[in-house]
């Protein structure tokens, strides 16, 4: 069991989780994330082919504004588009084959550690599968988050 004593940065906490992970795939789900119906079965089915990363669609709500985020290896990171579609390269919330990204490290920081790690992991991708389903929801509220704004 890991206990959050708040003495470490978010990046070091994520790294500790990655270091003890033993499953074939890893994905990070935080308290502002919700996995939607069908997530586990869809990921397990897609993992049968052993791709380096499994991407999907996400509902993102940022300070009350909503967008659908489509993760895919063919995409660059677009700015959040309220009321529309936002295309992004794979992030840490996607399912990653642990062995493919084992050498990627989270930085000792409380902001942007997810993007730092994701950019490293993206360079390791040789194979991918995209699940064209809404499987994840991200809900950010500046009034309640503990994460610093960047």
List the predicted regions and their residue ranges.
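Glycine-rich, basic loop-to-helix element that forms the pyrophosphate-binding segment
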Residues: 5-21
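Conserved nucleotide-sugar donor-binding
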Residues: 22-23, 89-104
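Short aromatic/hydrophobic "clamp" motif used to bind/position activated sugar donors
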Residues: 26
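The conserved acidic donor/metal-binding loop of glycosyltransferases
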Residues: 30-34
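Conserved donor NDP-sugar-binding/catalytic core segment of glycosyltransferases
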Residues: 40-69
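A recurrent flexible, glycine/aromatic-enriched loop bordering the glycosyltransferase active site
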Residues: 61-63, 75-96
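Acidic donor-binding loop at a coil-to-helix junction in glycosyltransferase catalytic cores
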Residues: 111-117
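Active-site donor/metal-binding and catalytic loop motifs
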Residues: 131-150
